[in-house]
């Protein structure tokens, strides 16, 4: 099933994001939803390289993507991070992922116990599941993906995604034999 592509952009330089968004549109097509700016305060992991305070904004793309292309999408966004870097430091962290009716998955170049290798040095991170009418946080979900602003945005994106298939909110996928 095709997936809804979402790309998170983390930066200290909010003014840079319009150029990053243009580069993303050149590669992935038009954007149909954009989140509000969300403060990124749960870790200082990126601050030495990127400064602070940091903020995240999520872009949802109009065109659905093949789930099997997530590794290539992550490699593309990694290259964009390099393009926007200065003096060897990233100015943006770009995190692609996809949304389906039942889950939200991010791509990562870092291995961890719950991540599945999908090729080309990239792993799929099941970040949130959707059941009983709401997104469900998992033990490893990044804290910034658990806040109400993020969950609300993802819920709105999910509604739009489901509408493209005319799926009711109560739809539950059923496994089929091939």
Where are these regions (language model features)?
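Long, contiguous binding/interaction regions
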Residues: 1-46, 52-56, 65-94, 98-177
């Amino acid at each position: 099933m095709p997936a809804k592509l979402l790309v998170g952009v983390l930066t200290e330089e909010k003014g840079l994001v319009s150029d990053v968004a243009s580069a993303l549109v050149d590669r992935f097509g038009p954007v149909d939803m954009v989140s509000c700016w969300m403060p990124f305060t749960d870790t200082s992991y990126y601050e030495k390289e990127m400064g602070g305070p940091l903020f995240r904004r999520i872009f949802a793309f109009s065109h659905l993507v093949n789930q099997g292309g997530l590794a290539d999408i992550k490699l593309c966004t990694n290259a964009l991070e390099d393009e926007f870097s200065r003096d060897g430091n990233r100015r943006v962290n770009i995190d692609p992922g996809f949304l389906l009716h039942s889950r939200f998955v991010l791509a990562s170049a870092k291995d961890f116990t719950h991540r599945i290798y999908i090729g080309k040095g990239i792993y799929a991170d099941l970040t949130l599941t959707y059941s009983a009418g709401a997104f469900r946080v998992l033990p490893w979900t990044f804290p910034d993906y658990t806040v109400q602003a993020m969950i609300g945005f993802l819920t709105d994106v999910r509604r739009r995604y489901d509408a493209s298939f005319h799926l009711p909110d109560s739809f539950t996928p059923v496994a089929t034999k091939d």
